[in-house]
């Protein structure tokens, strides 16, 4: 089983627009984080946990070619707003 953390930030992402804290001003790649999502891969199956606004970017960065299931943890926008971008997986 492979677990990939696609995003680990808050609902605003990091860096946060207009924020001048050390993390948001940092040039270290670890301080540039997408919104929360996890991909679980096992025996050719891909299960995605949450589909936030960074979904498209997360799929492209990680070269995900298919999704078999999606688990939505709750209905806040930072966990579901990327649903429209799932369409290419159905073609």
What is the role of each PLM region?
Residues 46-47, 51-91:
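Active-site metal-binding motif and surrounding structural segment of the metallo-beta-lactamase
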């Amino acid at each position: 089983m492979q677990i990939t953390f696609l995003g680990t930030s808050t609902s605003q992402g990091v860096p946060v627009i207009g924020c001048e804290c050390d993390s948001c001003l940092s040039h270290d790649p670890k301080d540039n984080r997408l919104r929360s999502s996890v991909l679980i891969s096992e025996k050719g199956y891909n299960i995605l946990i949450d589909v936030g606004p960074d979904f498209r970017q997360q799929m492209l960065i990680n070269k995900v070619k298919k999704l078999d299931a999606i688990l939505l943890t709750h209905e806040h926008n930072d966990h579901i707003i990327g649903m429209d971008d799932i369409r290419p997986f159905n073609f």
